[in-house]
């Protein structure tokens, strides 16, 4: 009778822990993979008939993602709260955001500020209920566009890959041309370099599209088997949308309550107060939004981990992954999200400084702010890239954030998967899609404001930048939560699982395994410690 292995939230026959030694070399033409007995061990659930297991990684028998001191099974770690300090800090910030919301919204409600949908010439000299309702409609628009986009990705993966890669390159070139036409020399020089690099990258990455398409289709098929992937992504999207709408009202109410010209202004209203309040709101929004997205990401990563390591479908995989993300691993998620939130805040600050320097005609300040903003953006990109695989480690083992990041990064480098990740086009699909949806949402906001022509825009056209920036941010965040929370999460999880045990993929999808072996032969070689 075959032995069963369960790495998920329920029963079912799975694959035994990897303990075999991969072959050291492969013939290009007649490669057959593992010995038949080893494949039977994996795919029929049979134990090997030798006295001692072969060593798979190094001189110990620990699984490659398994950190030092790990206790428990894969996807079923020993219950222990990780990084509790950051969980406490997050709860304090969240409580502060709730308290500020109550204060602002109560004052806003008591002041009886005019609220209307589509009404022209709305009274008031600052953002008001008209703006908040418009932001809520923007959230609904972004929600619909996100569903349409993910449906297109599921239906036309190759076309979407081709189109997004081309659009990304063309948008970089177009933005560069726009900066030169506008006379923004400092930013134009920097983005010219980016545009040239993007054109070079386009021709280099285009030949990787067949592999990216195959990976994308494989993950989508897995998601069809575990439909809870879409349920979790939808749940995260709804929570993200609701929180974005909540924040929209808080932003408007804060302006009305703390700006001297607001209709609900009190004794504590001042320019300094509104600046401090808005900094806190923006920071809290970034952090809480990141936590929401990363909870969904970690949960979906756990589901895909269960799917990869188990031969049969596992029941309650989503609930087990979600429970761990919301309890023992929440502190680690808050830790990683805090780093990104701080970088988001710094990037927004440098963008404001650059705009102010441009309006003042300060070329030196504009250049410095632009360079600083670009540096922060680059660092943020690296952190985002790093965090994805740390969260996957957390999903698989419930590890602490720092240890998870170090363990996963070391494994990815040693297994050669970093080459695949760098060449992967899948993330471009969802990043580009989120950017396009953000632009369309901002365009909707612009048309809406043009048609309604509220009074605060008549008094100060500078509010257009605030409205469009918030609308773009809402659309971008909502769309990104869909892509990063479902298919892209599965792609990243499969990369990590492939690094740990590529032979499971060989049995489940020989075509994908063979393509990866041909382009990245180091992936199916043993790890040297």
From Swiss-Prot:
Sequence intervals crossing the membrane: 85-105, 133-153, 159-179, 185-205, 231-251, 272-292, 295-315, 326-346, 363-383, 428-448, 465-485
Residues bearing carbohydrate: 114, 271, 422
UniProt-annotated location(s): Cell membrane
One GO term describing the cellular component: plasma membrane
Extracellular side: 106-132, 180-184, 252-271, 316-325, 384-427, 486-529
Superkingdom, natural source: Eukaryota
GO biological process: one example: transmembrane transport
Biased composition (Low complexity): 22-48
Family matches, as InterPro entries: Choline_transptr-like (IPR007603)
A Pfam family matched in the record: Choline_transpo
GO molecular function per UniProt: transmembrane transporter activity
Cytoplasmic face of the membrane: 1-84, 154-158, 206-230, 293-294, 347-362, 449-464
Region (Disordered): 1-58
Keyword Cell membrane among record annotations: yes
Membrane topology: Multi-pass membrane protein
Keywords attached to this entry: Cell membrane, Glycoprotein, Membrane, Transmembrane, Transmembrane helix, Transport
Protein purpose: Probably involved in transport through the plasma membrane.
Family named by the database record: Belongs to the CTL (choline transporter-like) family.
UniProt protein name: Protein PNS1
Protein's organism: Mycosarcoma maydis (Corn smut fungus)
Gene: PNS1
């Amino acid at each position: 009778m075959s032995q069963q292995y369960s790495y998920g939230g329920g029963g079912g026959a799975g694959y035994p822990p990897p303990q075999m030694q991969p072959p050291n070399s492969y013939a290009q033409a007649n490669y057959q993979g593992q010995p038949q007995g080893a494949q039977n061990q994996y795919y029929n659930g049979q134990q090997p008939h030798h006295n001692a297991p072969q060593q798979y990684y190094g001189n110990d028998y620990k699984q490659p993602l398994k950190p030092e001191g790990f206790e428990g099974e894969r996807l079923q770690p020993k219950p222990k709260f990780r990084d509790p300090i950051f969980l406490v800090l997050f709860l304090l910030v969240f409580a502060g955001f709730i308290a500020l919301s109550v204060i602002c919204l109560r004052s806003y409600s008591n002041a009886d500020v005019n609220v209307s949908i589509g009404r022209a010439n709305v009274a008031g000299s600052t953002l008001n209920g008209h703006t908040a309702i418009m932001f809520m409609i923007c959230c609904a628009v972004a929600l619909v566009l996100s569903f349409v986009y993910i449906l297109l990705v599921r239906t036309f993966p190759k076309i979407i890959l081709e189109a997004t890669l081309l659009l990304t390159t063309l948008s970089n070139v177009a933005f560069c041309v726009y900066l030169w036409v506008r006379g923004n020399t400092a930013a134009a020089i920097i983005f010219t370099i980016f545009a040239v690099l993007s054109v070079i990258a386009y021709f280099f990455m285009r030949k990787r599209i067949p592999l990216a398409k195959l990976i994308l289709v494989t993950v989508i098929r897995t998601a069809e088997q575990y439909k809870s992937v879409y349920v979790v992504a939808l749940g995260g999207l709804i929570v993200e949308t609701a929180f974005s709408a909540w924040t929209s009202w808080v932003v408007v109410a804060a302006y009305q309550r703390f700006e001297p010209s607001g209709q609900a202004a009190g004794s504590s209203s001042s320019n300094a107060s509104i600046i401090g309040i808005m900094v806190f709101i923006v920071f809290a929004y970034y952090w809480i939004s990141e936590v929401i997205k990363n909870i969904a990401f970690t949960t979906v990563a756990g589901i895909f981990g269960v799917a990869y390591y188990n031969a049969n479908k596992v029941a309650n995989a989503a609930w087990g992954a979600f429970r761990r993300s919301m309890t023992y691993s929440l502190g680690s998620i808050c830790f990683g999200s805090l780093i990104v939130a701080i970088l988001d805040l710094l990037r927004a600050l440098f963008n404001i400084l650059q705009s102010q320097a441009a309006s003042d005609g300060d070329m030196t300040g504009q250049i410095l702010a632009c360079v600083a903003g670009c540096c922060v953006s680059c660092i943020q990109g690296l952190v985002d890239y790093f965090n994805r695989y740390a969260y996957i480690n957390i999903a698989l083992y419930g590890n602490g954030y720092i240890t998870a990041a170090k363990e996963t990064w070391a494994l990815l480098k040693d297994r050669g998967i970093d080459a695949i990740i760098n060449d992967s086009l899948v993330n471009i699909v969802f990043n580009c899609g989120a950017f396009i949806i953000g632009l369309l949402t901002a365009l909707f906001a612009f048309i809406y404001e043009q048609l309604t022509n509220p009074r605060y825009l008549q008094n100060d056209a500078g509010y257009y930048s605030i409205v469009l920036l918030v609308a773009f941010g809402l659309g971008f965040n909502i769309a990104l939560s869909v892509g990063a929370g479902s298919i892209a999460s599965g792609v990243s999880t499969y990369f990590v699982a492939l690094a740990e045990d590529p032979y499971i993929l060989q049995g489940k999808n020989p075509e994908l395994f063979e393509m990866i072996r041909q382009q990245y032969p180091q992936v199916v070689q043993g790890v040297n410690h």
